[in-house]
Each structure stands twice: as C-alpha cells, then as structure tokens.
Amino acid sequence: LVPATEVGARAGALAAELAAGPTAAYAETKRLLADGGSRPLTDSLAAECAAQRRLGTTTDHGTAVRAFLAKQRPAFVGS
C-alpha cells in the first residue's frame, strides 16, 4: 500500500522505471497474455516461440546479454 500523499510520486517513479526497461518485450508479453486465453495451448506456445525469435534479434536483447555477462545493469533503447 502507498500512502495517498505518495501516490503521484510513486506512480511517476514506476512509469520511469518501465519506460527505461525492455519496452518491446513488455509489449510482446502484454499481447501474448491478452491473446493466450482465447486460443489453444499449442497456438499460444507457437506465438511465444515466434515472439522470442523476433525479440532475440533486437538491440535490447543484445544489450541485455552483454550487461548480464558483464554483471552490469542494461541500458535499454526500445529497439
């Protein structure tokens, strides 16, 4: 729970944190979750596989892998 006096500041901090994250991956996750309940499991798994293939070619993916190997925090660019 967040005190009423801190809601605006906390919401702004959360928005900034999300905006600095892997936004393409967030969008794919949101899409997969929204669509997953209305199709068979095999279709959901195929869609997830395709999403991972797409995301694996992004700049953000390369950034994340390099940062992980260097034990650093990644700086995502949204692509």
Stretches found by the model and what they are:
Residues 1-46, 53, 76-79:
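C-terminal long alpha-helix characteristic of the crotonase
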Residues 51-52, 63-66:
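Low-complexity, intrinsically disordered Gly/Pro/Thr-rich segments
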Residues 57-61:
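Interdomain hinge/lid region at the active-site interface
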Residues 66-79:
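Terminal low-complexity tails and localization/encapsulation signals of metabolic enzymes
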